Design a protein with these regions (language model features):
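Nuclease catalytic cores
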Residues: 1-82, 88, 112-114
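Mg2+/Mn2+-dependent nuclease catalytic core
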Residues: 76-148
Length: 148
């Protein structure tokens, strides 16, 4: 019985973190820039800097936060918001970053990959000659995962 209670509490705590903290962290992350000067929450900036160069590149002056995107995929109209977008015209690349607060990274993985595929398909219509890639930032442990 005790294990069942622990499992329930653990699940509840994880869901609470994913929803409650998720909104707060998202709001702070959209205001962070690392260059030309550091702007935003100092604690989150430190986590981004400690996570490595690849993650830091999503928070430079050429990045955009909370980017709306809409269009048709298979005759269905979709309207989405990209957490972080970096377009580099010199290298003809587009990189998408989606923040996720889930502790159990496998639970919604298929759903998140499908969402990333939607972003990619919509962006391919805007940037047909660019290489587009997508990443998830798992906020519970600050792991950057390449998806597509």
């Amino acid at each position: 019985m005790n294990n069942q209670i622990n499992d329930f509490v653990s699940k509840y705590d994880g869901e609470q973190f994913a929803t409650g903290a998720g909104r707060e962290i998202h709001a702070k992350l959209q205001k962070i820039y690392l260059s030309p000067t550091k702007v935003g929450d100092a604690e989150l900036i430190a986590k981004i800097e400690n996570a490595g160069d690849e993650l830091q590149s999503f928070f430079m002056e050429n990045s955009k936060a909370e980017v709306p995107i809409a269009g048709f995929i298979n005759n269905e109209f979709l309207s989405r918001r990209i957490d972080r977008l970096v377009v580099d015209d010199a290298t003809k690349t587009v990189r998408v970053l989606d923040y996720k607060t889930d502790i159990n990274t496998d639970k919604f993985r298929d759903k998140y990959i499908a969402k990333m595929n939607e972003y990619i398909k919509l962006l391919q219509k805007i940037y047909p000659d660019y290489k587009i890639s997508g990443y998830i930032l798992w906020l519970h442990n600050w792991t950057l995962e390449y998806i597509i």
